[in-house]
């Protein structure tokens, strides 16, 4: 972006100056509305989410047999919800900032099959595509026991079709492992940020991995191009896919059920604050949409991004969405948080969700490494760097009197708050890689 344009952008949006300087930045969204007001802009409904629930239930008998690690939950891919009181104390001590309420962790980092939040959306979209093909071919009815999809006849049928996706790592893992298990031929286009072990794991499942020297945007574009030339190839579009988004959104009702089991209340007097790491936006956008449908105006969602990849904050704050990239303002999009190394946000998610998100913030790689170490020490839970992005949220919210006043929170409401950090990945990181992460924390 030339200087004159840049100066006028900064004049209009002074916060951009802090992003360019790679400062850890917090922006509380003045444009938030009620769910009733914001929902029509999403373009999806409660019914769409119910349909996704139903589809995952139809596939549960198949998943329970195809992936024995899901048998205990009857083929439902869901993660634990745990309190992390020792980490809460550690954060208060490190940042000299009390965190009112209770701190919880949602362990999507340890979801079965692929060990990340992408096991929600990625697996769901592959299943939705497989179902569509099998229904159209007359091989399946909605009332069948879907475990029949494990038969050689279905493997043979699906092998005529292929799936392609562009990814920084975790989405590729989910889609690659699931597609290969069903019998699809699958190609994952991986950006320069992708970890070597993620590529190796995919190849061990018989997935074709195409590597690029460039970032996520290039990998997605190349994947899209390659798929266009083959009528039997289905491209999973992380930037625009409504299906992926709905796969994530199922988490809302699931979390509501977990809260009920644990006797946790979410209402006007007991608000819920949720902190979601954000890359291109599909995962956190879908989860936030599901949470809003489940908890209404009593849930407040925040997106967390690396200082080197603040694409969603930049897009929503300026209103330019996918018309601007972090590279346009001179930011390099290089971060240890490989799952969040995205320079241009999803235009679909930004426009759909901008009224339903309370805020956005950035944090440095070093902050993620520090918190990764603290969580391992205090709670014995090991995550990958990007999964710690949400952990910086509670103290930002608790430190901001202006945010609290903007929403009219009383001291009592804040005392009764549940802070939920969404841990997005790390359960499958090899030990030597994890030790390198731990060594970088202070």
Curated annotation (Swiss-Prot):
<dbReference type="GO" id="GO:0036088">
    <property type="term" value="P:D-serine catabolic process"/>
</dbReference>
<dbReference type="Pfam" id="PF00291">
    <property type="entry name" value="PALP"/>
</dbReference>
<dbReference type="GO" id="GO:0030170">
    <property type="term" value="F:pyridoxal phosphate binding"/>
</dbReference>
<comment type="subunit">
    <text>Monomer.</text>
</comment>
<dbReference type="GO" id="GO:0051410">
    <property type="term" value="P:detoxification of nitrogen compound"/>
</dbReference>
<dbReference type="InterPro" id="IPR036052">
    <property type="entry name" value="TrpB-like_PALP_sf"/>
</dbReference>
<dbReference type="GO" id="GO:0008721">
    <property type="term" value="F:D-serine ammonia-lyase activity"/>
</dbReference>
<dbReference type="InterPro" id="IPR000634">
    <property type="entry name" value="Ser/Thr_deHydtase_PyrdxlP-BS"/>
</dbReference>
<dbReference type="GO" id="GO:0006974">
    <property type="term" value="P:DNA damage response"/>
</dbReference>
<feature type="modified residue" description="N6-(pyridoxal phosphate)lysine">
    <location>
        <position position="118"/>
    </location>
</feature>
<protein>
    <recommendedName>
        <fullName>D-serine dehydratase</fullName>
        <ecNumber>4.3.1.18</ecNumber>
    </recommendedName>
</protein>
<dbReference type="InterPro" id="IPR001926">
    <property type="entry name" value="TrpB-like_PALP"/>
</dbReference>
<keyword id="KW-0456">Lyase</keyword>
<dbReference type="GO" id="GO:0070178">
    <property type="term" value="P:D-serine metabolic process"/>
</dbReference>
<dbReference type="InterPro" id="IPR050147">
    <property type="entry name" value="Ser/Thr_Dehydratase"/>
</dbReference>
<dbReference type="GO" id="GO:0016836">
    <property type="term" value="F:hydro-lyase activity"/>
</dbReference>
<dbReference type="GO" id="GO:0005829">
    <property type="term" value="C:cytosol"/>
</dbReference>
<keyword id="KW-0663">Pyridoxal phosphate</keyword>
<dbReference type="InterPro" id="IPR011780">
    <property type="entry name" value="D_Ser_am_lyase"/>
</dbReference>
<dbReference type="GO" id="GO:0005737">
    <property type="term" value="C:cytoplasm"/>
</dbReference>
<comment type="similarity">
    <text>Belongs to the serine/threonine dehydratase family. DsdA subfamily.</text>
</comment>
